Amino acid sequence: MAPIRVALIGLSSSSPSWLSLAHLSYLLSARGQQKFQIVALQNSSLSAAEAAIKKYNFDPTVVKAYGSPEDLAKDENVDLVVSGTRVDVHYGNLKRLLEGWKATGKTAGKGVYSEWPLASNLQQVEELVALAKETGIKTAVGTQGWASPVVKKIGEVLKSGRVGKVLSSEVRLSGVTAEREVMQEKTEYFTRREVGGNMWSIGGGHLIDLLQSALGELTNVKSHFHIQRPLVPLKDSTTGTITRTVTSNTPDLLYVVGSLPASDTVQQNASLHLRMRRGPPFPGEPAFVWTLTGEKGEIRVSSKESVAIILGAGEVKIEIHDYQTDKVEEVEWKWEEWQEELPAPARNVGSVYEGVWEAWNEGISKEEGREKRYNDWEVAGRRHELLERLLVDNGF
């Protein structure tokens, strides 16, 4: 099979980013290069794209530079476009790209893999989802927590019947930002709802997707959101000095409660409870604790890192309490060999790329028999709808 030809939108030459740390690390790995080939970069200007080509030592005769999505859309040598910009830039780039493909009439075999969130607001998301459906392009979105071997190991334990059916599940998360009062200047946009990238839309979105992928789609959802610290001092990451103070209009404390559907591993109307709080946990406590209370035992997942499962970084412990013996046992989990060779941020993201490859080469997919390959934009639309509804319900 020929490699899938990839164009990257938003690869910066000036600073490390999620696109370089996670996506590029996989794409340039030996395994990644067997399946994908980078053939183009698009940035906010042609010169910015050319600077990135030089920064990452790409061959300019192979990797083309573009300064607009319209120009990128004209490149017939591109199969898959990966958008890794900040969330408020996704919509403009992706809409113009899809409209460019539509205008040429050459949408067959084209695909887009966008980072999460898909766009700044639900209206933009719905427009992109509809346009993708109209043009028939393949889509993927960067919600990759479901691909974590921790989540897969939990699935194995549940299917084994060891703890019986899940009666309830609870998640407590403290973190997302390192400090409870101050934010880095570069993450100031977390305080502005209109940007679309904040604790709830990013951290909450990833977590809600992970939980629903593991346990089923939530119903009867209720919530309470609150801004505990509306005034947020911003700190220069280099000097450590406070540069200014801004007023936040995004929640920093969130409670969500819902019901889970019946399945082979979950009781009908089992309860799910989520609490997210910005800032570090109480000293000595894990930043992330996820419990699954079953009929015969309880699973406890914990980590000192609040988003370890999603990012693939940090230590994560799985423990099982057997009610009958009253003993607690730690359950081992591990990455696949090819993932261990990658930097931590690239491991779960690499699974999404593997899924894209399989989906584009159905023979391989059927032979390997994977149940889930990646989330598409329709799934992203459902996640965005829930996130937006809860924000509106709470007056945001």
Summary of predicted features, one role per range:
Residues 1-59:
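N-terminal Rossmann-like dinucleotide-binding module
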Residues 2-3, 33, 42, 47, ...:
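C-terminal helix-rich "cap/oligomerization" subdomain common to oxidoreductases
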Residues 12-15, 145-248:
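Predominantly a Rossmann-like dinucleotide-binding segment in NAD(P)-dependent oxidoreductases
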Residues 39, 63, 79, 110, ...:
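Conserved acidic residues
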Residues 63-76:
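Short acidic low-complexity segments
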Residues 79-80, 86, 91-147, 161:
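Beta-strand-loop-alpha-helix segment that lines the small-molecule cofactor/substrate pocket
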Residues 202-311, 358-363:
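Contiguous beta-strand/loop segments that form the cofactor/metal-binding neighborhood of enzyme cores
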Residues 278-351:
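Glycine-enriched catalytic-core subsegment of oxygenase/oxidase enzymes
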